[in-house]
């Protein structure tokens, strides 16, 4: 029995299947962890969702910002952008089934035995694990309820960007969503910066990557995350695993086998299904 952690798939179905074949993933015996952003940008979002859903208890995933955006498009709140290549999924006969399954997926995965935590963007240093659990449950409860379109309509925005237990209502839910699915940089006090997307070396002072600011979760648990392709899987402290290596941008899809910490990569097919110039310009 092995545990395989894979970074953001972004609709790159062929690469996902090739990578799983490479590591000899066996559903029912092995477990697959996925860092979120299953969909958008790659050509196979529909196939990715169908496959991941079919794995049942053999998969543990978290929602990413692109997954939430897909749900907002599905609910008629956001516009379907051609660059996301979501139309085949939205028009599929099983779209309702797939997307109602997707909105019931978690924002946070925890394995106490492995001392492993996974969230799409990471864990804000302002939270301990109990707070992270409670916050994840708050958003998950709304997403799985009949009122989920109301939340999706209100989730867009960058404020509030500083955690307080006193946060209430939609502001609280928006902060939680941003922390779990959009966070990259923080100010030294842990306050979120929602604007900078560059590599840590290029970020303006005093911003730091969230994982460079001491927090209680990282003291006791390993943290796996995706979301930040420009890290290229590098530059994180021991016990922090950055798994998004930009497959949908022409990079690779990365897998970490947890038991021996061995990495496996599958090169992107992006240059094969579009012109080199377009891929380079993305």
Curated annotation (Swiss-Prot):
Family matches, as HAMAP family = ApaH (MF_00199)
What is a single molecular function from GO for this protein? bis(5'-nucleosyl)-tetraphosphatase (symmetrical) activity
Q: Which Gene3D superfamilies match?
A: 3.60.21.10
Hydrolase in keyword set? yes
Q: Please list the reactions this protein catalyses.
A: P(1),P(4)-bis(5'-adenosyl) tetraphosphate + H2O = 2 ADP + 2 H(+)
A Pfam family found in this protein is: Metallophos
Q: State the protein's purpose.
A: Hydrolyzes diadenosine 5',5'''-P1,P4-tetraphosphate to yield ADP.
Can you name the source organism? Escherichia coli (strain SMS-3-5 / SECEC)
Q: What is its EC number?
A: 3.6.1.41
According to UniProt, the name of this protein is Bis(5'-nucleosyl)-tetraphosphatase, symmetrical
């Amino acid at each position: 029995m092995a545990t395989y952690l894979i970074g953001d798939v972004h609709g790159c179905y062929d690469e996902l299947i090739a990578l799983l074949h490479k590591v000899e993933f066996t559903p029912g015996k092995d477990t697959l962890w996925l860092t979120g952003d299953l969909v958008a940008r790659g050509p196979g979002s529909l196939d990715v969702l169908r496959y991941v859903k079919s794995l049942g208890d053999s998969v543990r995933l978290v929602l990413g910002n692109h997954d939430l955006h897909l749900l907002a498009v599905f609910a008629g709140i956001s516009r379907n952008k051609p660059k996301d290549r979501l139309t085949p999924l939205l028009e599929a006969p099983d779209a309702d089934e797939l997307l109602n399954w997707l909105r019931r997926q978690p924002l946070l995965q925890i394995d106490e035995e492995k001392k492993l935590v996974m969230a799409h963007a990471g864990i804000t240093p302002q939270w301990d694990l109990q707070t992270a659990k409670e916050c994840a449950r708050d958003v998950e409860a709304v997403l799985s309820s009949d009122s989920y379109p109301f939340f999706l309509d209100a989730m867009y925005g960058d404020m509030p960007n500083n955690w307080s237990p006193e946060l209430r209502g939609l502001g609280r839910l928006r902060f939680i969503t941003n922390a779990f699915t959009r966070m990259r940089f923080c100010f030294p006090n842990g306050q979120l910066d929602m604007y900078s997307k560059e590599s840590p070396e290029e970020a303006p002072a005093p911003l730091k990557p969230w994982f460079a600011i001491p927090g209680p979760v990282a003291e006791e648990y390993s943290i796996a995350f995706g979301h930040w392709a420009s890290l290229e899987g590098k530059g994180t402290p021991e016990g922090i695993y950055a798994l998004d290596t930009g497959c949908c941008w022409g990079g690779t899809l990365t897998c970490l086998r947890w038991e021996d910490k061995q990495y496996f990569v599958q090169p992107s097919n992006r240059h094969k299904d579009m012109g080199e110039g377009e891929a380079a310009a993305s």
